[in-house]
Amino acid sequence: EYYQKLGYALQKNKKYAEAIDAYLKADTLKPDNIWNNRHLAICYRLNRNYQAALSYYKKVEEATPEDTNVIFHIGSCLAELGQYEEAANYFFKLDFIESNCIKAWRGIGWCSFISRKYEQAMKYYEKIIEQKPLAIDYMNAGHVAWTMGDIQKATALYGKSITANGNRERFLEMFRKDKEALLKQGIQEEDIPLMLDLL
C-alpha cells in the first residue's frame, strides 16, 4: 500500500515516470491488482508510452470488460499505435454499451478516415455535428469531405471550424498537425495552400 500511495501522490503531481516506478514496486509486492494496473495504464498513457499503457489497460479489461473508460482508452492507445481497425472495434463496442457516445463517434470517425472508409467516417462526423460539435469535429469532417472530392462541403466545414475555434490561427495550428494524415489520404501537398486560401 505504501508504494501505491506514493505512486498516486507522484501521479497527482504529474511526475508520471516516478509514479510508474512506485506502482511497479507495488506490483512486485502485490501482482495484478486492478487499481494498480489501472494507474500504471494511466501513467504510461500520459507519458505517451502507448504500448505499455495498452498492456495494462488490457489487464484491467480482463477484470472489468464493460468499463467504458477502459474501452475508450484501449481504443485510443491502439489508434496512437496506428492499429486503426482494432481501435475502431473498441470504439464500436463503446458506442454499443453507451448510447449517443460522442467520444466513441469521434474515434470511429477518425479511424474510419485513416482506414479510407470515408462514407462511414462522414456518417459519424455528421452524427457529432448534429449533437455537440467541437472545432476539431468540423475540421475532421472537412478532411473527409475533401478526400471524397467535395471541395464546397470541405470549405464550409473548415469555415465552421474556424468560427468554432474563435480565430483562424488556432484552426491553422490544428490543421497543420493533420497535414501528414491528409497526404496519406491522397491530398496533394500543393493543394493544401490552395484550400487554405479558399477559407
Write out the residue ranges for each language-model feature.
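Terminal, low-structured helical/coil segments at or just beyond the last alpha-helical repeat
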Residues: 164-199
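TPR/TPR-like (Sel1-like) alpha-helical repeat modules
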Residues: 130, 143-170, 196-197
